[in-house]
Amino acid sequence: IAYFPTNENVRAYKDLMPILGDDPYFLYNYAVALYGKGCLEESLNVALQCRTYWADYDLELLLGDIYLDKNEHIEAESHYRKASFMCPSRFTPLYKIYSLYRRIGDGKEATAMAQLILEKPIKIQSNTIDFIKAQVRRDLELK
């Protein structure tokens, strides 16, 4: 229910907080549901509470996305970098950093990150990696 947030789902999570509020999986899914509903502050609070119990790649990406939506770019980048350190073979954190640099108009850093993405070896081929590399190539061609 976290990935299809409705008011009922969010209300169910809220009702379960007193019982499951120390379960990191519950907290993560609750934070995702709140984020999906656009409740950035509540989502951030729950995600940070989750982080006290759990160090997780997906949680760092979620925190980065929340901070990005709050226009707190330094915090967003920090969480994307933590996700990248946790799973160095993954492309998504690098792409999120690249997209952040483009969003704030830092062409120099965006280009450096683009080169890193394009030169990064692929451990396991996927559609996501194909999309990321194709998008970065297109962006560089449009420069």
List where the protein language model places each region:
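Register position in tetratricopeptide repeats
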Residues: 2-5, 36, 69, 103, ...
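TPR/TPR-like (Sel1-like) alpha-helical repeat modules
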Residues: 83-85, 91, 95-125
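Conserved structural position within tetratricopeptide repeats
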Residues: 17-18, 48-52, 81-85, 119
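Short coil turns that delineate tetratricopeptide repeat
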Residues: 21, 54-55, 88, 122
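Alpha-solenoid helical repeat scaffolds
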Residues: 25-29, 58-62, 92-96, 112, ...
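Hydrophobic/aromatic packing residues within the alpha-helices of TPR/SEL1-like helical repeat arrays
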Residues: 13-14, 47, 80, 114
